[in-house]
Each structure stands twice: as structure tokens, then as C-alpha cells.
Amino acid sequence: MTFRRRLLQFLALLFVVATLAQLWYLGQVLRLQHHNPDSSAYMHRAQKQGNVQQDWRDYDQISDYLKRAVLISEDAHFTQHTGFDWEGIRYALKRNMEAGKPVAGGSTITQQLAKNLYLSGERTYTRKAQEAVIALMLEIGLSKRRILELYLNVAQWGHQIYGAEAAAQHYFQISAAQLSPLQAAQLAAMLPRPNLYDFKGPTDYVQQRASWIQAQMALVRIPDPGTVPLPPPPEPTAPPEGNTQ
């Protein structure tokens, strides 16, 4: 058998394996239309270190303040993009170049959800490419409301703490539906690195960021908002500097 033929066979096998993998991911995404995930890749790994705190809550059982705060913190253009925020990516690249090191990420809520549900946190081109493919599947297969609901239920909010309900209970001893604007902003300020940015910790960055998030809440659109009134939107300001990778 010639080298060329072996190479073609290898490439054909690689294509088949890659296609089957994408079909598996697609099946998992389509299942999310009507079924809540039992766990996530991040929770599965965390369970090896002990019990994971997580209680599922439907979209309407989570405070609109938290939805607004999370979008302000992580993805202000969530309702407008199709999985990728090119403006956010350009802004992150600019900040990283100015700092000479990674200090900002450009991942959307959808991309973060893809990573949290199915992938690892390793920074490789292969993982980022797979994340992009799954993000497209999520955007095509699910509504914005459903994507945000899923994210709020699987996002990490501290050691072994996953989802809005577990976070609200752990930090404030209340349900996710009862979170105030300040409490919601404090939780959102911890994302996406809650083990580094704990608002009860010694750093001033999280408290400053929480204040900024709370001030910006009225500026963001959320899917299917409730009837809770918000104050008039303030003038947009720049967020405090910090590592948001």
C-alpha cells in the first residue's frame, strides 16, 4: 500500500470520526429543547472532588435582575448576535494587546454554555473550534430564552456551586427569584472566574465591578422580561479593569 493511499484512508477515517462527533453533539443540543441536562462537563469533573451544589430553576423562577446583571457582565449583545459577538472579540483583543497579556475574553454566553456543558477549560485551537461549532448548534436549535436559562443553571459560582439557585442559597440564603439588584450584580461580578473573584473576598475589584454592573442593568435587553420596574438607564461607562478570562 502506497503512502498516498494510506494518507487518504487516514484522512477519510478522520473525517468520519469528526462527523460522528458533531452528530453526537447535535443530538445532545436538540435534546435540550425539551429536557434539562442532568449535569455538565464542569460539574462532572467537580463531582470527583465532592458533592456538587445545584438545583434547577426554570427561567421564570430566576430574578430578572440576575439575568440583566449576567448579560451586562458577560454578553451585553446576547439578544442581538448569533453566537459570536465580533465587537466584543475586537474589544478583548485590543485590551489584551494593550496589556501585553490576556486580561479579557470575547466569549459570548452561548460559547460559555457550549464549553460548560460539553468541553474542558483548556485553551487550545481545537477546543475553541469545537466550542464555536456547538455554539452555532445552540443558536440554531434553541431560543435565546432557553440558552440563557441553561447558562444560569450550569454556570459555576464558586467551589462546587453551580447554577443561580445554589449560588443564591449559598451566598444570601434566599432563592434565585428573590435576588435584589445588588445581590444579582455581586453574583454576576464573579463570572466567569468565581474561584478567583469572590465578592466576599479581599479584592476591591469585584465590589467595584458589582457597582458598575448594577448601574448598567437598565441598558441591556433580556429575553421575555418580567414586570419588575428598573430605574432609567445611566450614561454608559467603562467597566473596571480586571482579568475576565
UniProtKB/Swiss-Prot annotation:
Which PANTHER family did the record assign?
BIOSYNTHETIC PEPTIDOGLYCAN TRANSGLYCOSYLASE, MONOFUNCTIONAL BIOSYNTHETIC PEPTIDOGLYCAN TRANSGLYCOSYLASE
Origin: domain of life: Bacteria
For molecular function, the Gene Ontology terms on record are:
pentosyltransferase activity; peptidoglycan glycosyltransferase activity
Question: Which spans are transmembrane here?
Answer: 10-30
Could you tell me the membrane topology recorded for this protein? Single-pass membrane protein
Cysteines paired by S-S bonds = none
Name the InterPro entries for this protein: Glyco_trans_51, Lysozyme-like_dom_sf, PBP_transglycosylase, Pep_trsgly
Q: What is the lineage of its organism?
A: Bacteria, Pseudomonadati, Pseudomonadota, Gammaproteobacteria, Oceanospirillales
Keyword field: Cell inner membrane, Cell membrane, Cell shape, Cell wall biogenesis/degradation, Glycosyltransferase, Membrane, Peptidoglycan synthesis, Transferase, Transmembrane, Transmembrane helix
Question: What's this protein's function?
Answer: Peptidoglycan polymerase that catalyzes glycan chain elongation from lipid-linked precursors.
Q: Where is the composition biased (Pro residues)?
A: 226-239
As for family, the record states:
Belongs to the glycosyltransferase 51 family.
The molecule here is called Biosynthetic peptidoglycan transglycosylase
Write the Enzyme Commission number(s) for this entry: 2.4.99.28
Map out region (Disordered) in residue numbers: 224-245
Provide GO CC annotations from the record. Answer: peptidoglycan-based cell wall; plasma membrane
What reaction does this enzyme carry out catalytically?
Answer: [GlcNAc-(1->4)-Mur2Ac(oyl-L-Ala-gamma-D-Glu-L-Lys-D-Ala-D-Ala)](n)-di-trans,octa-cis-undecaprenyl diphosphate + beta-D-GlcNAc-(1->4)-Mur2Ac(oyl-L-Ala-gamma-D-Glu-L-Lys-D-Ala-D-Ala)-di-trans,octa-cis-undecaprenyl diphosphate = [GlcNAc-(1->4)-Mur2Ac(oyl-L-Ala-gamma-D-Glu-L-Lys-D-Ala-D-Ala)](n+1)-di-trans,octa-cis-undecaprenyl diphosphate + di-trans,octa-cis-undecaprenyl diphosphate + H(+)
Q: In which pathway does it act?
A: Cell wall biogenesis; peptidoglycan biosynthesis
Query: Per UniProt, what is one Pfam family of this protein?
Result: Transgly
Provide the protein's localization. Answer: Cell inner membrane
The residues forming the signal peptide are: none
Q: Which gene encodes it?
A: mtgA
User: Does the keyword Cell wall biogenesis/degradation belong to this entry?
Assistant: yes
Gene3D superfamilies per the record? Biosynthetic peptidoglycan transglycosylase-like
What is a biological process (GO) this protein takes part in? Answer: peptidoglycan biosynthetic process
